[in-house]
Amino acid sequence: MAKKSLIYREKKRQKLEQQYHLIRRSSKKEISQIPSLSEKWKIHGKLQSPPRNSAPTRLHRRCFSTGRPRANYRDFGLSGHILREMVHAGLLPGATRSSW
């Protein structure tokens, strides 16, 4: 189980990313449309003004049940070992154990 502080920090980053998403998108669109280099630098400075944690690259997927940051499956939102336990227990409909 991940520390509670790390889980809360990730949730805070998600909120910040949603809050500043439109500002970042509009600034990037302006940069692509303006041909003048000096104006691009001004807009680039405005793009750097939001908090660092509001950048989408700072987000990290975490397991829904344990908060583990590694080996996550996007389709389920679970880490690998929790996914395996749930499939073996029959808790995930449609998921089957592999055998070859």
Curated annotation (Swiss-Prot):
The gene is rps14. GO terms for biological process: translation. The lineage of its organism: Eukaryota, Viridiplantae, Streptophyta, Embryophyta, Tracheophyta. Its main location: plastid. It is found in: Plastid, Chloroplast. Binds 16S rRNA, required for the assembly of 30S particles. PANTHER family: 30S RIBOSOMAL PROTEIN S14, SMALL RIBOSOMAL SUBUNIT PROTEIN US14M. This is Small ribosomal subunit protein uS14c. It comes from the Eukaryota. Keywords: Chloroplast, Plastid, Ribonucleoprotein, Ribosomal protein, RNA-binding, rRNA-binding. One of its GO terms (molecular function) is rRNA binding. Part of the 30S ribosomal subunit. HAMAP family: Ribosomal_uS14_1. Belongs to the universal ribosomal protein uS14 family. GO terms for cellular component: chloroplast; small ribosomal subunit. InterPro entries: Ribosomal_uS14, Ribosomal_uS14_bac/plastid, Ribosomal_uS14_CS.
